[in-house]
């Protein structure tokens, strides 16, 4: 399908099928479509409303081009789309560390900040973790600790090709949606936070098509109803659960899990150094109750998605124990020490 045909289809307001979208993305990544046409395609996809098939097709193309890394089917990713402008600290990163200490295998795919002061890569780097480990080093780290951080630019070098077009457009495109779906370890278990409720069904279907075995797609609200791309302890959380190809929907509030409701201002983040200190204090047992419960809630969902907990309530108990016994702090210290040793042995992925 030539790019002129793709443009004709999109200009008519029609959707691309999954195979058509895959061929389109293949052509973009192969340099077979000029930048001006790429810009038009991305704009029209956004204008028409991106479909689950289009997301699934684009994902398939990009995953095939990712630098491969093999972990195992137990691995869980905790990530969000970003874009909520709420300015919270790195809740999903803190949750990943707590869940890992509670026995959950974590393969966290992340990047530097786009809409906030501090992304997952920023805060982990500030905590002392080498974020650009060679894939062999990351695999070894995962085998020893059950934790891996997969730095997106390292595993998706082909994405550089569209960076200038995306920057010149200055709008959200399908690439902003694809991030949480592009874990190079091809994880089968995910907690995905989305900033816009209309994206929930799209993610659920795209994850189903990718072979995901268990995922929770969550959209939170602040106390005033503003959007959050994570499970909320400030208001309601809307959830779509995907398990064994079946989806169900429900809405929760913090008190359903014996958590308090906190103002979103109590979860404010800052610079990478400030957020790293906040997470350290959280793992030391010195954070505020609001910060603690926000991280516990997300960690509990990760425990549930992993299969280690039978429900979110049980996950909260597991996460609380990991914090109370300082296991999460000791675990982070071990991850940092081992990863530095492995960096010396294998070098970085840029080598």
From Swiss-Prot:
<feature type="binding site">
    <location>
        <position position="230"/>
    </location>
    <ligand>
        <name>Mg(2+) 2</name>
    </ligand>
</feature>
<keyword id="KW-0808">Transferase</keyword>
<feature type="binding site">
    <location>
        <position position="120"/>
    </location>
    <ligand>
        <name>5-phospho-alpha-D-ribose 1-diphosphate</name>
    </ligand>
</feature>
<dbReference type="InterPro" id="IPR036320">
    <property type="entry name" value="Glycosyl_Trfase_fam3_N_dom_sf"/>
</dbReference>
<dbReference type="InterPro" id="IPR005940">
    <property type="entry name" value="Anthranilate_Pribosyl_Tfrase"/>
</dbReference>
<feature type="binding site">
    <location>
        <position position="166"/>
    </location>
    <ligand>
        <name>anthranilate 2</name>
    </ligand>
</feature>
<dbReference type="Pfam" id="PF00591">
    <property type="entry name" value="Glycos_transf_3"/>
</dbReference>
<dbReference type="GO" id="GO:0000162">
    <property type="term" value="P:L-tryptophan biosynthetic process"/>
</dbReference>
<comment type="similarity">
    <text>Belongs to the anthranilate phosphoribosyltransferase family.</text>
</comment>
<dbReference type="InterPro" id="IPR035902">
    <property type="entry name" value="Nuc_phospho_transferase"/>
</dbReference>
<dbReference type="Pfam" id="PF02885">
    <property type="entry name" value="Glycos_trans_3N"/>
</dbReference>
<keyword id="KW-0822">Tryptophan biosynthesis</keyword>
<comment type="subunit">
    <text>Homodimer.</text>
</comment>
<feature type="binding site">
    <location>
        <position position="80"/>
    </location>
    <ligand>
        <name>anthranilate 1</name>
    </ligand>
</feature>
<keyword id="KW-0328">Glycosyltransferase</keyword>
<feature type="binding site">
    <location>
        <position position="88"/>
    </location>
    <ligand>
        <name>5-phospho-alpha-D-ribose 1-diphosphate</name>
    </ligand>
</feature>
<keyword id="KW-0057">Aromatic amino acid biosynthesis</keyword>
<dbReference type="GO" id="GO:0005829">
    <property type="term" value="C:cytosol"/>
</dbReference>
<dbReference type="InterPro" id="IPR017459">
    <property type="entry name" value="Glycosyl_Trfase_fam3_N_dom"/>
</dbReference>
<keyword id="KW-0028">Amino-acid biosynthesis</keyword>
<protein>
    <recommendedName>
        <fullName>Anthranilate phosphoribosyltransferase</fullName>
        <ecNumber>2.4.2.18</ecNumber>
    </recommendedName>
</protein>
<feature type="binding site">
    <location>
        <begin position="83"/>
        <end position="84"/>
    </location>
    <ligand>
        <name>5-phospho-alpha-D-ribose 1-diphosphate</name>
    </ligand>
</feature>
<dbReference type="InterPro" id="IPR000312">
    <property type="entry name" value="Glycosyl_Trfase_fam3"/>
</dbReference>
<feature type="binding site">
    <location>
        <position position="229"/>
    </location>
    <ligand>
        <name>Mg(2+) 2</name>
    </ligand>
</feature>
<feature type="binding site">
    <location>
        <position position="111"/>
    </location>
    <ligand>
        <name>anthranilate 1</name>
    </ligand>
</feature>
<comment type="pathway">
    <text>Amino-acid biosynthesis; L-tryptophan biosynthesis; L-tryptophan from chorismate: step 2/5.</text>
</comment>
<keyword id="KW-0479">Metal-binding</keyword>
<feature type="binding site">
    <location>
        <position position="230"/>
    </location>
    <ligand>
        <name>Mg(2+) 1</name>
    </ligand>
</feature>
<feature type="binding site">
    <location>
        <position position="92"/>
    </location>
    <ligand>
        <name>Mg(2+) 1</name>
    </ligand>
</feature>
<feature type="binding site">
    <location>
        <position position="80"/>
    </location>
    <ligand>
        <name>5-phospho-alpha-D-ribose 1-diphosphate</name>
    </ligand>
</feature>
<comment type="function">
    <text>Catalyzes the transfer of the phosphoribosyl group of 5-phosphorylribose-1-pyrophosphate (PRPP) to anthranilate to yield N-(5'-phosphoribosyl)-anthranilate (PRA).</text>
</comment>
<feature type="binding site">
    <location>
        <begin position="108"/>
        <end position="116"/>
    </location>
    <ligand>
        <name>5-phospho-alpha-D-ribose 1-diphosphate</name>
    </ligand>
</feature>
<keyword id="KW-0460">Magnesium</keyword>
<dbReference type="GO" id="GO:0000287">
    <property type="term" value="F:magnesium ion binding"/>
</dbReference>
<feature type="binding site">
    <location>
        <begin position="90"/>
        <end position="93"/>
    </location>
    <ligand>
        <name>5-phospho-alpha-D-ribose 1-diphosphate</name>
    </ligand>
</feature>
<dbReference type="GO" id="GO:0004048">
    <property type="term" value="F:anthranilate phosphoribosyltransferase activity"/>
</dbReference>
